[in-house]
């Protein structure tokens, strides 16, 4: 059994086949969506699965062109416990939309402020410090930092906030990724694929590098999921 806490299976060539095989193996997948309309289209296709979930997302890279979807996000948010992919992206290609990204994220976080029954997967590229500040401001309790690539020094603050990190095989292949992996406490590590966008997404290879078992990841995952019950 593997646990994939960040996968875009709706973007796979054959999503139904992908999640059906995962379900048959007992694998757990939390699917991301990039927009509310994608969640609305995909939700019906995961009904009945025991180990497969779909998250309601609003990707920061699409914020500038997708403001019309925010009302749909507000409507759909009551139908799921899983939120993602949301966040901020201040990398050079998207830095010109910084203000509208922040405005959009504030809108979203205001809808789930203090909600212990939501699990949130966040994108934080080049905006890790700003994103953490907003998550704390809006008292978002259950957060997974997906494919973290920020400063080593901020990891302590993220851990102190009670948050987790989802890590993937690609991180094991770069010097910065390996340094980050060596810094995150093992009890705060979850696994992800980020497929199909990430071409290096073999979760078992990630586990081998980390010297962690599937059971250890499952225990971390259960600790996080159990928070959502209270």
Which ranges hold each PLM region?
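Mid-domain alpha/beta scaffold segments of enzyme catalytic cores
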Residues: 1-230
